[in-house]
Structure formats: C-alpha cells, structure tokens
Amino acid sequence: MANNNNPFSMSTMLNSLQDTEKKNPAVPPPPPPYGVVTLATPPGYAPPPPTYHPCPCGFCDETPSQWMFRLMTRSEEEDAAYPFKEFISKLSKTDLQGIASLLTSDPDYFLAIARNKNGSNRLQRLIGKSDDVDELICAAILYRFLHVMTDKHPSYVATRGLRVFAGKKKEFLCEELIRNALLIARDRHGCVALNEMLTDLDHPYYRNQLLDVVAHDALSLSHDASGNFVIQHALKLNDPRTTRNVALSLRGHCIDLSFKKYGSYIVERLLDANESVAVVVMELVESDGDRLMRLARSEFGNYVIAKALRVTQKRMARVELFRDLVQKLMPFLTFLRKSRGSNIADFLESVREN
C-alpha cells in the first residue's frame, strides 16, 4: 500500500473525499413512495467521457465521486491495463471501507453505478471483502430496494448480496424481499431476480415464507406476463409443500389457464407432481362437456389434456381418474380427429382398441 504522503495514493484520495464531505455534506434524498418503481435514469447523472485525464493522480480535475464513477464503470479494455480485481486486492480494510462509503454515499450515485454493466460487476466483486463493506452495500440496496430489484444489472448486485451476506444483513434483505415479492414478480427484470433468489436462498425460514407468498398469489401471478415465470420456477423447485399450495390457489382455474400458452405450462407442471395431479384432472372431469371439447381442440389446451391422459394412465394410484377422463372425452372422438386435438383422438382410439 502506498504511503499516505504520496499525493497519488488511494489514502490521499480518500482523505480528499473526507475533506470534501466535511465542506459539502451529502444529504440523501427521501426514499420513493412505497410501491412506486421508477426506472428512469437518476437526474444529474450521465456516464463521464471515456477519455482519461492524462494526470496520473486521476482526480486533479475531478471530484472523488467522478473519479470513482469512472473507475467503476470503465470498459473491460480500459480495465485490462490495471484490473479492478488486482486494484482492490492491494487495499487495506480501511481503504476498502472508504471506497464502499463513497460508492454508497448517495442513493442515486450508487444506483447509477449499479445500472452500468461493468459497475454492477465491480460492485459484486466488493461484496464479501469485509463486514464493513457488506454493511454499507447492504444498506444501499435496501434504501432503493425496488429500484435495484427491478433493474437488470442492479438486481445482480442484490442477488450476489443474498448469497454472501450473513446474519442481520441477510435477514434484512430477506424481509424486504418478502415484503415486495409480488411487485418484483410482476416486473420483467424482477421476475428473473426473484427466481434466482428462490433458488439460492439457503435460509429455510425465509425461503418457506417467500414461497408461501408466491403460492398464495399464484392465480394473479399466473395471469401476469412476468409473474407466470415465477410460478413455473416455484414448481420446478419440486418442493411438495409449495406445489400443494400453488395447486390449492389454482383450483377451479386450471382450464382457464390451459387456454393460454404460459398458463398451460403451469398446468402441465402441476400434472407432473403427485401432490397436484388430482386437482387438475378432477377439474377436467367435472367440467362442462362443451368447454372440455373446446379446450381439447385449442392450441395449447390439447397438450394439457394429452398429458393428463398419459400421466394418469402410468400411475396405478390414478387409474380411476384416468378412466373418468377417458369416458368424459370419448363422446367427442369424432370432433377431435380433424382438429388440434387429433393427438387426443389417437390416444383414445388406442385405448379403445386395447
């Protein structure tokens, strides 16, 4: 580590930052209204020009914040000369804390760096370097949690934090995630981040709580363009309790979902699980005949019914459900032959021949 008397050292830069903050203390803006997600670029922030100032100190004509923004967001080509990973490996814990303090000193500043692909990657590298660094980054994530979770590159920082943070930091992050899970699930970037967290969360209590929130709102999420991916993912986890809860939430709505592309994927997932197959098949058997025929001839519904037949035929414990479904469909055999339901007609004919 360079001596503090060196005007080009990191310590000198951090001391300069402290002097600047004493003269012009930063006052964080108030948090956004609860539930409001604003994805616009923070006012007053734009990436600085890519050309480096020739002065080796790096901040003669820049504030410490500008210097740090440029360091965090520079391109991979610019980083190759002196990689960020190597740079932070030579810093003391005090200097690392100083960097983290600068990066998190203003919520808009932190978010602007996190929205940059390279900035996001370098913030992720800082996570886990020390408990003090983690506390500062965790606090910054929590302060703008919805903004972070519903933006592509910032959400990677939060996901990394959930994997690495321990103790109260992880608990605070989990509690905020559970509190905002449904808003996040309905966002195109948020649903991806939420799925990652559902997979990675290694705290049984919070994981079950999060899955319960998702399962309880499975119906509304299943009809949402982004939320349906969260329900599909929750079912892929093969957690019996969650599968049962999702099935209970969707009971009576499986046929409606089966008419839609992504909804049919969810219903097919339910057919795969012992805990939920009966819920789907009973709804098919008890449905109005005309409605069942329309489903069997529909673009996506025919796959659901064909799968229901295959699944119940193979499972001895479901033989009664299989027989009931075949009897329900057999009167429509003629109508199914020359339609999207021809696969169902072929199956029924093979059963009748046997």
Task: Please tell me what each predicted stretch does.
Residues 1-354:
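Eukaryotic gene-expression regulator signature that favors modular helical reader/repeat domains
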